[in-house]
Design a protein with these regions (language model features):
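Sec-dependent signal peptide recognition
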Residues: 1-7
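N-terminal signal peptide c-region/cleavage motif recognized by signal peptidases
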Residues: 11-14
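Beta-strand-rich N-terminal accessory domains
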Residues: 17-51, 88-92, 97-101, 601
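Catalytic-domain carbohydrate-binding cleft regions of carbohydrate-active enzymes
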Residues: 24, 28, 97-624, 628
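Short, well-ordered beta-strand segments enriched in hydrophobic/aromatic residues
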Residues: 25, 37, 102-109, 582-586, ...
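Extended, loop-rich substrate-binding clefts of extracytoplasmic carbohydrate-active enzymes
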Residues: 60-104
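Surface-exposed beta-strand/loop patches in extracellular or lumenal glycoproteins
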Residues: 114-117, 591-604, 665-684, 703, ...
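Accessory, solvent-exposed terminal regions and/or long lumenal/extracellular loops of proteins
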Residues: 631-694
Length: 718
């Protein structure tokens, strides 16, 4: 009896009708019949109870609401509820309440669907690639979304997250389930669940500010087996992809000529990808990235020298990589013999994906011995000098494979220091970049920005928006150069330049227009200058979970009404914060050919036009603000401190927006830091002192006061 009373005192209060638990400012209230869940934070309601029941069991298409039958405490001291339905379905729920997170681990008495349901909330954001699949309009607000078979492979959906954040209400919600899920965020309900739980399933609700929510989400991802891994610096520079420049049929000569032309024209390339065509060409059984270590002798007669050529120019060299093995390929027999592929009825299952064209076996990612075998095979590529891989498994939708089908492999490669451009993932981030699905000239151009922002909301903010201009060699569209195509190339390059990474493809020189060449080169050079700043934000994401590289305005400014309702194909207000100082405002969308201006929302504070230095007091909307091709789509605000490259140096650029701003910059090694603090009384007479007592020289350039910074040193500007 005394143990029970102590448990009640520490963990909550039981009354005839309710169960209440509290930690910090977070309170969970559960009503018994039917079980209804309500959550408050700091005295304000965040997630409301659904009147028809908050926990449902049984048939996934006709689940039943459950009620609380009894309460107890587990061996770990956690509150445990026994619940049941009117038809006799039952389950146990283990509850954990902390200051910013509530976990519900549900264990049904038999395999069945388990759903958690709250009252409707809006607007909501997230859902990864699913945010742009099967919806009537492109919009980051997922209100109205309902999918009772939420799984990768539905259309272009490969980067998968069912994390949904409601910034106005100050909560986020998900079920941790790599298999088929139920996800609804409608005018009637906020519901998530698993269609079939074999043993147990976890639901998490995060509460607080967006920074608090994303930090808790990060900690849980790392704790529950969905790790966020540390990205690497080179991938945040300007790159080049053979698929964009040369399509599938690559060879040593044309790749070398194309990359060397870009370098000669002043493009600051830091990485490159040859995604296909390097394998032996004669036999179809070799036509896949799993020809490990075997190059076509005519197309790539000296792969080691070929790769070394690019290393000598400072580029990281990557190849395409999939976990699909052509059934009669060079390594498939060993995989079958050792039971390393996905099986059916005790035999390796033969499948047919979108690529390769031949029947394949698929590596069983759930077996550690299969992952180790695959990584050992990858070393056959690494031995030639390959630095990493563009992961691009696709076309598997009809097989119902788990969303996490590539995570273990990519994690193992990342732990070896390989560069990974990720395309498939579930909640985890075992990659340096999160690639938006193939994005081409012939497609609706609102998909790209909505897709990128949706990924950022969902915990995937290391956005690579695919190849600038897309893939001209696939035959998807007429290659005739038109004024529309020229405008597209300029707009696409400028939009890409303010993401974590940008990759060149079709040569700017092929359009026969000096303006196109000038604008595309300027976009690449802008991205190159910002590479250290972008990477610093990526490391902050890795450490804190918050999407510092691409923070949508509803996340960065959740209490400002003007931040909402803009990221859609009607308003086309595609804006986001980069770090604590830059606001990206690219003019993009399906009206790119005719649009020359946008309504730009500036959140609270002082903002400066990056190009002109003109100052604006906000919050305000700049109606029909001119953004012609070539205008840098950036404003500076917040801390007012931006780190850029200047030749071989890194410089802190201080803009006149906040005399008391401060920031911490993380260097390209991902470890060293510098803090910069402003204490400005007179902008016309600035002095920079280092903490070691030294004085740094600075000068006004391009609307900002610049001075060189060095790793490990801290600075004050006054």
């Amino acid at each position: 009896m005394s143990r029970l009373l102590l448990g009640l005192a520490l963990s909550g209060v039981v009354s005839a009708q309710t169960i209440s638990m509290q930690a910090g400012g977070t309170q969970l209230t559960i009503k018994r019949q039917p079980l209804r869940i309500a959550i408050e934070h700091n005295g304000a309601p965040v997630a409301g109870a659904h009147s028809d029941g908050g926990l449902l069991l049984g048939n996934p298409d006709h689940p039943e609401p459950a009620s609380v039958v009894s309460e107890s405490f587990g061996d770990n001291g956690r509150r445990v509820l026994t619940i049941g339905t009117s038809s006799g379905k039952s389950a146990r729920i283990a509850l954990t309440v902390t200051a910013h997170q509530i976990d519900f681990v549900v264990q049904p008495s038999e395999p069945e669907a388990v759903l958690m349901r709250f009252a409707p909330a809006s607007p909501g954001f997230g859902l990864g690639d699913h945010a742009v699949v099967g919806r009537p309009h492109f919009d980051t607000d997922i209100t109205g979304y309902s999918n009772d078979r939420f799984l990768s492979g539905q259309g272009l959906s490969r980067m998968i997250s069912n994390f949904v954040i409601y910034p106005k209400q100050k909560f986020a919600f998900l079920v941790w389930e790599p298999n088929t899920k139920i996800v609804r965020s409608t005018a009637q309900e906020c519901t998530q669940g698993s269609r079939r739980v074999e043993s147990s399933v976890r639901f998490s609700v995060f509460v607080g500010t967006p920074k608090e929510i994303y930090r808790q989400f990060l900690e849980s991802r790392n704790l529950f087996g969905y790790p966020v891994m540390k990205p690497k610096y080179a991938f945040f520079g300007v790159g080049w992809e053979a698929f964009g420049a040369l399509a599938w049929d690559t060879d040593q000569k044309t790749v070398t000529e194309n990359v060397d032309r870009y370098l000669a024209d002043g493009y600051p390339l830091k990485w490159m990808v040859v995604g296909s065509g390097f394998w032996p060409n004669v036999e179809n059984r070799m036509h896949e990235t799993t020809s490990f270590g075997l190059y076509d002798p005519k197309r790539y007669p000296d792969p080691a020298a070929f790769i070394a050529h690019f290393h000598s120019k400072g580029l990281k060299y990557l190849q395409g990589l999939r976990t699909t093995f052509i059934t009669d390929g060079p390594y498939s027999a060993a995989g079958v013999k050792n039971n390393l592929f996905v099986e059916e009825a005790g035999h390796a299952k033969v499948m047919k994906f979108g690529w390769p064209k031949s029947p394949i076996y698929f590596l069983d990612w759930r077996k550690p011995e299969a992952v180790n075998w695959f990584v050992d095979l990858v070393h056959r590529w690494t031995s030639f000098g390959v630095d990493g891989y563009k992961e691009d498994v696709y076309g598997y939708g009809k097989y119902g494979l788990g969303d996490d089908k590539l995570d273990a492999i990519n994690e193992a490669l990342m732990r070896e220091g390989q560069y990974i451009m990720g395309r498939n993932a579930y909640l985890a981030s075992p990659a340096d970049l999160h690639r938006v699905n193939d994005f081409n000239y012939d497609q609706n151009q609102d998909r790209g920005p909505v897709n990128a922002l949706a990924l950022a909301y969902s915990g995937f903010p290391l956005i690579y928006p695919d190849i600038v201009g897309g893939t001209f060699g696939e035959g998807h569209f007429d290659l005739k150069v038109t004024p529309r195509m020229k405008t597209y190339m300029m707009r696409n390059a400028q939009w890409a330049s303010v993401h974590c990474s940008m990759g060149m493809g079709q040569g700017p020189w092929t359009f026969g227009d000096p303006q196109v060449e000038k604008v595309m080169l300027a976009a690449a050079q802008l991205h190159d200058r910002l590479q250290p700043y972008l990477y610093s934000q990526a490391i902050r994401f890795y450490l804190e979970g918050y999407p510092w590289t691409m923070a949508p305005l509803p996340v960065a400014f959740p209490d400002e009404e003007g931040a909402y309702g803009r990221e859609n194909d009607h308003v086309r207000g595609y804006e986001w914060m980069i770090g604590d100082a830059l606001l990206a405002t690219p003019l993009y969308g399906n009206d790119y050919e005719s649009a020359t201006a946008r309504d730009i929302y500036l959140p609270s504070g002082v903002w400066i036009d990056y190009d002109t230095g003109k100052k604006y007091q906000a919050p305000t909307t700049l109606h029909q603000f001119a953004l012609p091709p070539g205008k840098t789509p950036l404003f500076v605000g917040g801390s007012g401190i931006v780190i850029e490259k200047r030749g071989a140096d890194l410089v802190a650029r201080i803009f006149r927006v906040n005399g008391n701003g401060q920031t911490t910059f993380i260097y390209p090694d991902g470890l060293a830091k510098s803090s910069i603090k402003l204490n400005v009384a007179d902008w016309n007479h600035l002095r920079v002192t280092a903490k070691n007592g030294g004085i740094r020289k600075g000068a006004w350039k391009r609307n900002a006061f610049e001075f060189v910074i060095t790793p490990g040193e801290n600075y004050e500007v006054h």
